[in-house]
C-alpha cells in the first residue's frame, strides 16, 4: 500500500513587519481600488468596492470606497503598519472618503499626493455624462 505523503515539512513563512507604507487609491467613476504597499511597492493588502460586496452603481459611492479602504487597512495592520503616505489617482467620488477611512482606522497619514495622469491634450475624452 502506498504511503501517504506528509505535506508542509518546510519552513513556516514569517510575516515581515513594515512600519511605513504607501496607500494607493485609484478612484474611477465606476469603482474604487485601494492597494497598500511597502515603500518599495510590494503589495501588503488590497481591496475594492466591488470586492467588498457592492455591485452595480453602488460601487461608485463614497460609502463603498470607505468600506473598501477600511478592509484594506485592517488587512495591512497584521504587518505592523503605522505611518501611511497616500497617493490618490482618478476623479471618482470615493477619493476623499477613502482617505478619511484610513485616518479613522488609526494610521498616521504623513503625506497626501494626487498622482492622477494629466494628458497634454492627448486622447479625446468620452462624451459628457447624461444623468
UniProtKB/Swiss-Prot annotation:
<dbReference type="Pfam" id="PF00411">
    <property type="entry name" value="Ribosomal_S11"/>
</dbReference>
<comment type="subunit">
    <text>Part of the 30S ribosomal subunit. Interacts with proteins S7 and S18. Binds to IF-3.</text>
</comment>
<keyword id="KW-0689">Ribosomal protein</keyword>
<comment type="function">
    <text>Located on the platform of the 30S subunit, it bridges several disparate RNA helices of the 16S rRNA. Forms part of the Shine-Dalgarno cleft in the 70S ribosome.</text>
</comment>
<keyword id="KW-0699">rRNA-binding</keyword>
<comment type="similarity">
    <text>Belongs to the universal ribosomal protein uS11 family.</text>
</comment>
<keyword id="KW-0687">Ribonucleoprotein</keyword>
<dbReference type="GO" id="GO:0005840">
    <property type="term" value="C:ribosome"/>
</dbReference>
<keyword id="KW-0694">RNA-binding</keyword>
<dbReference type="InterPro" id="IPR036967">
    <property type="entry name" value="Ribosomal_uS11_sf"/>
</dbReference>
<dbReference type="InterPro" id="IPR018102">
    <property type="entry name" value="Ribosomal_uS11_CS"/>
</dbReference>
<dbReference type="InterPro" id="IPR019981">
    <property type="entry name" value="Ribosomal_uS11_bac-type"/>
</dbReference>
<dbReference type="InterPro" id="IPR001971">
    <property type="entry name" value="Ribosomal_uS11"/>
</dbReference>
<dbReference type="GO" id="GO:0003735">
    <property type="term" value="F:structural constituent of ribosome"/>
</dbReference>
<protein>
    <recommendedName>
        <fullName>Small ribosomal subunit protein uS11</fullName>
    </recommendedName>
</protein>
<dbReference type="GO" id="GO:0006412">
    <property type="term" value="P:translation"/>
</dbReference>
<dbReference type="GO" id="GO:1990904">
    <property type="term" value="C:ribonucleoprotein complex"/>
</dbReference>
<dbReference type="GO" id="GO:0019843">
    <property type="term" value="F:rRNA binding"/>
</dbReference>
Amino acid at each position: 500500500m502506498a504511503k501517504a505523503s506528509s505535506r508542509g515539512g518546510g519552513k513556516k513563512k514569517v510575516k515581515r513587519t513594515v512600519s511605513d507604507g504607501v496607500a494607493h487609491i485609484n478612484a474611477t467613476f465606476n469603482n474604487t481600488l485601494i492597494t497598500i504597499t511597502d515603500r518599495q511597492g510590494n503589495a501588503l493588502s488590497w481591496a475594492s468596492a466591488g470586492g467588498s460586496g457592492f455591485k452595480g452603481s453602488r460601487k461608485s459611492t463614497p460609502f463603498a470606497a470607505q468600506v473598501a479602504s477600511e478592509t484594506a487597512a485592517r488587512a495591512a495592520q497584521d504587518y505592523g503598519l503605522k505611518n501611511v503616505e497616500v497617493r490618490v489617482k482618478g476623479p471618482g467620488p470615493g477619493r476623499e472618503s477613502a482617505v478619511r477611512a484610513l485616518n479613522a482606522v488609526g494610521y498616521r497619514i504623513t503625506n497626501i499626493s494626487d498622482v492622477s495622469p494629466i494628458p497634454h491634450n492627448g486622447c479625446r475624452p468620452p462624451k459628457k455624462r447624461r444623468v
